[in-house]
Amino acid sequence: MKTFVLGGGCFWCLDAVYQKTKGVTSVISGYTGGHDRHPDYYSVCSGTTGHAEVVAVSFEEDVIPAEVILDMFFALHDPTTLNRQGYDVGTQYRSSMFYETTEEKILFEEAIERNQALWAHPIVTEVSRLPVFHVAEDFHQDYYAKHPEQGYCQVIINPKLAKARKYYSAWLNA
């Protein structure tokens, strides 16, 4: 079992896709990368905590390779925009990868190099050591599964799910 902590904009988006991915056993929305010891959604959204919205994606490598998890990450958000994803603007929405081991750091750096060719502009994804992972409030866990009709889900998340189905259908559950 391996766990990657990834930030690619609003955590609801990555959560929605990874929840449907074969071999993924857990997706937990949370916050990391900042200085506030007790972050919550409102403090993180204020931009004063330094934290990013992230997901901790746990997966079985014998079912899905780490490289596929990371390539999906780069396909599902724009890693070339600093501190924003579409209409979501602020440091909490930065493209980020948080590692616990040197092996993970190397995997992340290789994924950036591998995926750079897909983008016209330089990838600005932050690669940092994971300080502390703070689990987000219950309201944010499995958000898409609980609220698929909500406007944000319809306008922002559904196109990401469609993209995942188009390019990664072999890795998604039916």
Swiss-Prot record:
The protein's name: Peptide methionine sulfoxide reductase MsrA
Molecular function, one GO term: peptide-methionine (S)-S-oxide reductase activity
Key words, A-Z: Oxidoreductase
EC class name: oxidoreductase
Phylogenetic placement of the source organism: Bacteria, Bacillati, Actinomycetota, Actinomycetes, Micrococcales
EC number, UniProt record: 1.8.4.11
Family: Belongs to the MsrA Met sulfoxide reductase family.
Catalytic residues (UniProt): C10
Function in brief: Has an important function as a repair enzyme for proteins that have been inactivated by oxidation. Catalyzes the reversible oxidation-reduction of methionine sulfoxide in proteins to methionine.
One of the Pfam families matching this protein, by short name: PMSR
GO BP term, pick one: protein modification process
Organism in which the protein naturally occurs: Arthrobacter sp. (strain FB24)
